């Protein structure tokens, strides 16, 4: 049908849960004295951007309540659809986050791109350049890229395919 059940993974409660986990990481890094370098939170296939917005909102609330200095962070909304990225860049609710450097966008084709080029800041995130951990959020991402399945039989690797329907009754599978 082409429909993605977005409410299940892009609601305020899910955003708050992710924000809480991210805050835990930021707190741990701060307690280790690692609060100089920016932490990147990369959402692969951000779609409509709602989850990212909820996470940013909650992080701001939690950051204000934190008793310690946290490392700076930048949430990166990525997508393979340029129209979505343009929407994020123009959306009024995102402007404050862009201005603070807490939000950026990037076109990412997971089958081709090795680097993530941030559109607003011009920063290129590439392998080995960051010293802080990168948080990656991938709701409804891996189901939209080609997958390969292999198994091991008597010391030989073989590929296989998954079928949603069987030629035999379910009881015999």
Spans of model-derived segments:
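Rossmann-like AdoMet
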Residues: 1-42, 48-133, 145, 150, ...
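A mobile, often basic/glycine-rich helix-loop segment
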Residues: 138-173
């Amino acid at each position: 049908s082409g429909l993605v059940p977005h409410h299940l993974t892009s609601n305020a409660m899910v955003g708050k849960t992710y924000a809480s986990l991210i805050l835990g990481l930021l707190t741990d890094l701060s307690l280790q004295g690692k609060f100089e370098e920016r932490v990147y939170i990369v959402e692969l296939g951000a779609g409509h951007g709602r989850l990212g917005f909820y996470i940013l909102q909650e992080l701001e609330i939690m950051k204000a309540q934190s008793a310690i200095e946290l490392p700076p962070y930048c949430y990166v909304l990525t997508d393979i659809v340029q129209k979505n990225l343009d929407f994020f860049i123009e959306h009024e609710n995102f402007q404050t986050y862009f201005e603070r450097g807490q939000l950026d966008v990037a076109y990412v084709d997971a089958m081709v791109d090795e680097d993530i080029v941030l559109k607003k800041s011009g920063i290129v995130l590439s392998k080995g350049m960051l010293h802080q951990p990168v948080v990656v959020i991938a709701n409804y991402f891996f189901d939209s890229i080609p997958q390969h399945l292999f198994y091991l039989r008597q010391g030989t690797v073989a590929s296989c395919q998954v079928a949603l329907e069987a030629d035999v009754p379910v009881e015999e599978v």
